[in-house]
C-alpha cells in the first residue's frame, strides 16, 4: 500500500477535463483549485469528520452512483468534470471512470499487506447485486446488470457498465459484477455500485503482515 493512501489525478483531453482527489481511509480532503467555475451543485455531496464526498460530473445519475461507491468504500472523494455533454454522456462517463481508476491505483500503490480478493453483495429493495474484485494488476471486467431502460435520469444505461469497465481497466483490477435480481433499473444499478464498494473494501482489508498476496511476489 502507498504511504498516504491518497491520490490526486487530473485528466485533460479535447473532450473532457476531470480532476479527482481520493483518500482511501476517508478524513478531510480538498482540491486546491476547482475547474467548475460557478457551475456547482450539492446533490452528490456530504461532509463529516470521517468522510468528505463531492461528486460533480454534470450527469446527475452518474454523480449518484459514484457517491454511493465512495460512501460504502469508506473513501473521501472529490470528483469534478467539465465534459462535452452537448454531444452526449459517453466521454464524460468514460473519462470519469478512467480517472477514478487511476486514482485508486495510485492510492493503493504496491499491493501488499491486504487480502487482495474481495466479495460484496448489496441489496436495494427488490434488487440484489454481487461483485468480486481482485487487485491483480490484470485489468478485466465482466459486468452484467440486465438493464432495460434506455436512460436513467440523464445517463444512458449502456454507459453504466462502461463506467465500471473503464474504472477496472485504469485501476488494473479484475472486476466481476452482476445483478442477480431486480425489476427497477435504478435499484439494479445502485445495488451494483454498492456491491463493488463492499468488494473493494473487503479486498483492501489489512492482513497484519507486509506480504505480497501473490506467488509472483509482486502486484502492481
From Swiss-Prot:
A Gene Ontology BP annotation from the UniProt entry: L-histidine biosynthetic process
GO function terms (MF aspect): imidazoleglycerol-phosphate dehydratase activity
Keywords: Amino-acid biosynthesis, Histidine biosynthesis, Lyase
Enzymatic reactions: D-erythro-1-(imidazol-4-yl)glycerol 3-phosphate = 3-(imidazol-4-yl)-2-oxopropyl phosphate + H2O
InterPro entries in UniProt: IGPD_sf, ImidazoleglycerolP_deHydtase, ImidazoleglycerP_deHydtase_CS, Ribosomal_Su5_D2-typ_SF
Enzyme Commission number(s): 4.2.1.19
Pathway it works in: Amino-acid biosynthesis; L-histidine biosynthesis; L-histidine from 5-phospho-alpha-D-ribose 1-diphosphate: step 6/9
Signal peptide per UniProt: none
HAMAP family: HisB (MF_00076)
Family per similarity comment: Belongs to the imidazoleglycerol-phosphate dehydratase family.
Stored NCBIfam families: PRK00951.2-4
Protein name in UniProt: Imidazoleglycerol-phosphate dehydratase
The organism's taxonomic lineage, starting at the top: Eukaryota, Fungi, Dikarya, Ascomycota, Saccharomycotina
Amino acid at each position: 500500500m502507498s504511504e498516504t493512501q491518497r491520490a490526486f489525478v487530473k485528466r485533460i483531453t479535447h473532450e473532457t477535463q476531470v480532476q479527482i482527489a481520493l483518500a482511501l481511509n476517508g478524513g478531510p480532503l480538498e482540491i486546491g483549485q476547482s475547474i467548475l467555475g460557478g457551475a456547482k451543485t450539492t446533490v452528490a455531496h456530504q461532509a463529516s469528520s470521517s468522510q468528505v464526498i463531492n461528486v460533480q460530473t454534470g450527469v446527475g445519475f452518474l454523480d449518484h452512483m459514484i457517491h454511493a461507491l465512495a460512501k460504502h468504500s469508506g473513501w473521501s472523494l472529490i470528483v469534478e468534470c467539465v465534459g462535452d455533454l452537448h454531444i452526449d454522456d459517453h466521454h464524460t462517463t468514460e473519462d470519469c471512470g478512467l480517472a477514478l481508476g487511476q486514482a485508486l491505483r495510485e492510492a493503493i500503490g504496491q499491493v501488499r499487506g491486504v487480502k487482495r480478493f474481495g466479495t460484496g453483495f448489496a441489496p436495494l429493495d427488490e434488487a440484489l447485486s454481487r461483485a468480486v474484485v481482485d487487485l491483480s494488476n490484470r485489468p478485466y471486467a465482466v459486468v452484467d446488470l440486465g438493464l432495460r431502460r434506455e436512460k436513467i435520469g440523464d445517463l444512458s444505461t449502456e454507459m453504466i457498465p462502461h463506467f465500471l469497465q473503464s474504472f477496472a481497466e485504469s485501476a488494473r483490477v479484475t472486476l466481476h459484477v452482476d445483478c442477480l435480481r431486480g425489476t427497477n433499473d435504478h435499484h439494479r444499478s445502485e445495488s451494483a455500485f454498492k456491491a463493488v464498494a463492499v468488494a473493494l473494501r473487503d479486498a483492501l482489508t489489512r492482513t497484519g503482515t507486509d506480504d505480497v498476496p501473490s506467488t509472483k511476489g509482486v502486484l502492481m
